[in-house]
Design a protein with these regions (language model features):
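Interhelical loop and helix-boundary elements at the membrane-water interface
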Residues: 2-40, 54, 73-103, 122-153
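Short hydrophobic/aromatic-rich motifs at helix boundaries and adjacent loops
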Residues: 17-18, 47-51, 59, 70-74
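Short Lys/Arg-rich amphipathic alpha-helical segments
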Residues: 30-49, 60-64, 68
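Helix-coil boundary and interhelical linker segments in multi-pass alpha-helical membrane proteins
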Residues: 46-63, 102-114, 160-166
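Alpha-helical transmembrane segments of multi-pass membrane proteins
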Residues: 47, 65-74, 98, 103-104, ...
Length: 166
């Protein structure tokens, strides 16, 4: 088994902007559960983007999400190469994108966003089929991003169904 890749220093993140983004502005440096730490930062940023209204105009939301995903493929791929680790656990930009996809699909409201956070983390950690299948087979920046995007999609669709039923 290959030893875990070491964490970069925060000063290295500041010197290398792609690592600063990939490591979620430093949240990926958390010694335990960096994915959850990154997801919490992503949740806080999303709340800030919406002015705590927990909703954005659809066009702005999907444009922002598309940009985050496209940039994320490049950011995660570059960071993985710089860290010499195919999917370093500290790279959490993919958590940002996945959670934001969940929130884009969620009904508006604080409670829905908290439920989305929890569901997203469950899908991202447990990785049910087909998430695990993609996680094992796809490599590079797209491979790092795809499992979190699928986790975000699954969590968001569950919230949509729950919102329609409730």
């Amino acid at each position: 088994m290959k030893p875990a890749a070491p964490l970069p220093s925060f000063s290295r993140l500041l010197r290398e902007p792609v690592l600063l983004l990939a490591f979620g502005f430093g949240s990926g440096l958390a010694p335990r559960a960096p994915g959850t730490a990154g997801s919490l930062v992503a949740l806080a940023l999303a709340a800030g983007f919406t002015g705590l209204s927990f909703t954005l105009p659809a066009a702005a939301l999907w444009l922002l999400l598309g940009t985050v995903v496209a940039a994320g493929i490049a950011i995660c791929g570059s960071a993985a190469r710089r860290m010499d680790a195919p999917d370093h656990p500290g790279i959490v930009w993919d958590e940002f994108a996945g959670l934001w996809l969940t929130l884009a699909l969620a009904p508006a409201g604080f409670g829905w966003w908290i439920a989305g956070f929890v569901l997203f983390r469950i899908f991202d950690i447990v990785k049910p089929w087909p998430i695990a299948w993609f996680d094992r087979r796809w490599k590079g920046g797209l491979g790092i991003m795809v499992d979190d995007l699928l986790a975000g999609l699954f969590a968001g669709l569950m919230l949509r169904v729950a919102g329609a039923v409730l």
